[in-house]
């Protein structure tokens, strides 16, 4: 078992990861003693792992779980209300711990419910998708979507623990695995050139779900995320770099309809748009763009946006991006493999050219 600490003072917490972790109840003990426990999961994950987790936690006071529909299109206030209703109907108070068993949607909704219910209760992340394991479960971003924008309603609220069972990836559909790899690749682009090169050299090992390769990749991503969050918890500075590709990507998700493109797919296409924008500003040369595209393609990820989207479609959604400051669009752009920056003065003319030529 490996452990990484997210250092946030009194709100610090561990990320633990290994194979077969979900069979080990002792990792939960310190957080669940004398607590009521409500597991939140979805219709896809429940048949795979709910009973297993309930069995491991049988010595604790687990109440009836909440099983949500599966998909980004259900990441709404309406669906989150079912968590609140369950808490209230079961007369659960502040001595309750929520456990998010699932991917990013389950984790985001459970975390936001924990932040909101009775002004804050504890929660634990048990991410079952690659994307959630390397990104969304760590750092305390919790939210639901709005028809006008992704993750627009939410809070920063840290979990008590993140427990990553790498064996969960054995039941992950290939398309979902590829979507998670988009976020893995992102870390190499913005932070760690050696890690990017390692990914280029270990494509087949990762695609075959080699446990050693997955353990290293997930661990490195969590190390980077923990370091960034410790330096900038509420995204006032360096944490914004983690949004590489997301401004374009969120526009794709919102325009196409949540769930049509997986989040990681939209991030991959958005990252290529960001790389081409950086190339157009002479921040990087074309060889770097080609390396980024080649690595995304190796994991069967899209490298261009939907044909149906034009510049006007993108810019309408991008103007609502959470990084917009005083009405000015701010884009995360690569400056090299392993380095990125935030840019405010990107002309509409360049963006239109990049999108039109994609």
Curated annotation (Swiss-Prot):
Its cofactor is Co(2+); Zn(2+); NAD(+). GO terms for cellular component: cytoplasm. Zn(2+) binds at residues 183, 246, 263. It catalyses: 7-phospho-2-dehydro-3-deoxy-D-arabino-heptonate = 3-dehydroquinate + phosphate. GO terms for molecular function: 3-dehydroquinate synthase activity; metal ion binding; nucleotide binding. It comes from the Bacteria. Keywords: Amino-acid biosynthesis, Aromatic amino acid biosynthesis, Cobalt, Cytoplasm, Lyase, Metal-binding, NAD, Nucleotide-binding, Zinc. Binds 1 divalent metal cation per subunit. Can use either Co(2+) or Zn(2+). The keyword Membrane does not apply. It is found in: Cytoplasm. NAD(+) binds at residues 70-75, 104-108, 128-129, 141, 150, 168-171. Pathway: Metabolic intermediate biosynthesis; chorismate biosynthesis; chorismate from D-erythrose 4-phosphate and phosphoenolpyruvate: step 2/7. GO terms for biological process: amino acid biosynthetic process; aromatic amino acid family biosynthetic process; chorismate biosynthetic process. Its EC number is 4.2.3.4. Belongs to the sugar phosphate cyclases superfamily. Dehydroquinate synthase family. Catalyzes the conversion of 3-deoxy-D-arabino-heptulosonate 7-phosphate (DAHP) to dehydroquinate (DHQ). HAMAP family: DHQ_synthase. This is 3-dehydroquinate synthase. It comes from Shewanella sediminis (strain HAW-EB3). The lineage of its organism: Bacteria, Pseudomonadati, Pseudomonadota, Gammaproteobacteria, Alteromonadales. The gene is aroB.
């Amino acid at each position: 078992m490996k452990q990484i600490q997210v250092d946030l003072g009194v709100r610090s917490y561990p990320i633990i990861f290994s194979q077969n972790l979900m069979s080990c109840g002792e990792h939960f003990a310190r957080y669940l003693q004398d607590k009521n426990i409500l597991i939140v999961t979805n219709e896809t994950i429940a048949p795979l792992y709910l009973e297993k987790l309930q069995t491991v936690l049988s010595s604790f006071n687990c109440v009836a779980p909440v099983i949500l529909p599966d998909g980004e299109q259900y990441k709404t206030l309406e669906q989150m209300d079912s968590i609140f209703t369950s808490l209230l109907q079961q007369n659960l108070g502040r001595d309750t711990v929520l456990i998010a068993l699932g991917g990013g949607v389950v984790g985001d909704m459970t975390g936001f419910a924990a932040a909101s219910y009775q002004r804050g209760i504890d929660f634990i992340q048990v991410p079952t998708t690659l994307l959630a394991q390397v990104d969304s479960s760590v750092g305390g971003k919790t939210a639901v979507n709005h028809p006008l924008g992704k993750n627009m309603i939410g809070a920063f609220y840290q979990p008590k623990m993140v427990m990553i069972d790498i064996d969960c990836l054995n039941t992950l559909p290939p398309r979902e695995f590829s979507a998670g790899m988009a976020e893995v690749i992102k870390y190499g682009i913005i932070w760690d050139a050696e890690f990017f090169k390692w990914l280029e050299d270990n494509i087949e090992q990762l695609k075959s779900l080699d446990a050693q390769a997955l353990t290293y990749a997930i661990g490195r991503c969590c190390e980077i995320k923990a370091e960034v969050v410790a330096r900038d918890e509420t995204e006032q500075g360096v944490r914004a770099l983690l949004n590489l590709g997301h401004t374009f990507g969120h526009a794709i998700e919102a325009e196409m309809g949540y769930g049509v493109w997986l989040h990681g797919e939209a991030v991959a296409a958005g990252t290529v748009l960001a790389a081409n924008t950086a190339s157009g500003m002479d921040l990087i040369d074309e060889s770097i763009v080609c390396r980024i595209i080649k690595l995304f393609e190796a994991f069967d990820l899209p490298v261009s946006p939907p044909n149906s989207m034009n510049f006007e479609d993108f810019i309408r959604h991008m103007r609502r991006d959470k990084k917009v400051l005083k009405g000015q669009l701010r884009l995360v752009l690569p400056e090299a493999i392993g380095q990125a920056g935030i840019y405010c003065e990107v002309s509409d003319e360049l963006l239109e050219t990049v999108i039109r030529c994609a």
